[in-house]
Amino acid sequence: MKPFAVILLAFYALTMSAVPAKRERCTLVLADGRSVVATAMGDELVHYYLTDDGKYLQCSGDGVAHFVEPNALQKRWQTKVAKRQNFRAKKLASRQKKSQGSMTGSKRGLVILVQFPQTPFYYTNADFQRLFNEEGYTDDINFGSVHDYFLDASYGQFDFSFDVVGPITMSNPLSYYGKNNNNGDDSYPATMVAEAVQQIDPEVDFSQYDWDRDGVVEQIFVVHSGYDEAQNTRATSYIWSHAWTLTEALEEGDGEGPITVDGVVVDSYATSAELGGRTGTTTLSGIGTACHEFSHCFGLPDFYDTVGNSFGMDKWSLMDYGCYNGDGGIPVGFTSYERWFCGWLEPTELHNPLEVTDMPALTSEPIAYILRNSGKSDEYYLLENRQPESWDGEIAAHGLLVLHVDYDETAWTENTVNTVRNHQRMTIVPADNILYSFSLSGDTWPGTTGKTELSDYSTPTWGLFNENTDGQKLMNHSITEIAESEDGLISFIFDDEELGIRDVNANHNVNKAIYNLSGQRLCKPQKGINIINGKLYYEKD
């Protein structure tokens, strides 16, 4: 199915989605006074610290660190997700899928500025008007505005502007809404959102944010004063930026559920913080978190491992750690998948032998290629050209990036895309065959490795999770002669007729030396791939 076919359904299927913890090294103090250096990991659901030797820690409310077993973290995450999944199952059963098409044209979103009695805003409404709306906006860290980001991601098809209102002051201090409860969750963030909606209602016509006139506001966005717990993971009284619904929050004991104002229902929301970085800085937050959370409102799930430390998409996706590129001020551009999901790009299907030349950068033109598993069309590879320009200005490598997608509706709507280490459903095929964050510079083709071929027999290979029509987990295709020109254009050959896999019966005299892929000599071709006279052939029968 087309990936954006679940967009509007996903408006009503948001689990607690959040930005990942900023992976900063911290010195933690144990109960016995010892110090331990570890890296912040996880997200709003389950956050923890990971030492260099693979040990897990969490901090209690008083900031004291203690070791935990990874199985305990997994169980805690599964318990939280299961509770929310049960709720969503009931909700989804009562709704029908809607038509697509809301991610084009001109739309307006609502941004509410919220401050607290002891935590006033450092920046003004005018500053946020510029941050969200100004064309060509720049400041100390931001490459553009939120409006610029989505206009560029959509190739001009989605003109997303924002009405910024406030600031308004909450009735309680930040710690009331943000302090972590016994489960490690923020206590009352949805209560904060509901209070903000009710307080600003006399000034705002909420009905104008119901894009499809179904009686439900698509989303609202709350920017609160202070800092983000995702970037200050030991500050357990801060709010972790996230996207959620008031309905689901009610199930968790936070708030009273959806609010009806101006004849429409407010339910889906997202949040981010005013200030970026560590406590004590006064830098306006980068737009990366806002772009990430708004993208959840569009229906995109998280592509980082929401429970462990698998690679996912790392810095290659806004929905993973790419929201922090350039300290959050230059969030990485949408991948071809994300643009396709939103209806801004239609990848070219690869079926027959094809020579591709002058493939432009993804940031400049909506061009990508897709190769599907013949046995399961929802598993496929996407080929895109990533160059260090525009929103990709902070990427670690340039060249052809290969994405492997194994779409599953349940994993997407339940925000569990990359939680299984040996079955990541949205990731890349790194040219250097190293799927770790410390080796991003070797991810692209030909890149630093100089590799020019990707096939069933190359290293790395492009295997499958699901069987093809032949009952094997092979693509039975190849991409060869991958090259990058001096001006950043990509070329390659798909299924080279000279080098590709051929039909033995139709193309070859079998009275030659025949081998299998293990190097064993055969008397005659066997079903599958054979090496005959130094070339690859495919035996059908």
Language-model-detected regions and their locations in the chain:
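Fold-level signature of zinc-dependent metallopeptidase catalytic domains
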Residues: R88-G136, S175-S187, G226
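Residue-level detector of functionally pivotal "anchor" positions at catalytic/ligand-binding pockets or at interdomain
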Residues: F494-S518
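Extracellular low-complexity, Gly/Ser/Thr-rich intrinsically disordered linkers
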Residues: L362-E497
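C-terminal tail/sorting-segment detector
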Residues: S17, I529-D541
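Extracellular hydrolytic enzyme modules, especially secreted metalloproteases
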Residues: Y149, Q219-I395, D406-D408
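N-terminal prosegments of processed precursors
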Residues: S17-M103, S374
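Hydrophobic h-region of N-terminal signal peptides that target proteins for export
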Residues: L9-S17
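Active-site-proximal segments of metallohydrolase catalytic domains
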Residues: Q96-Q100, G144-D262
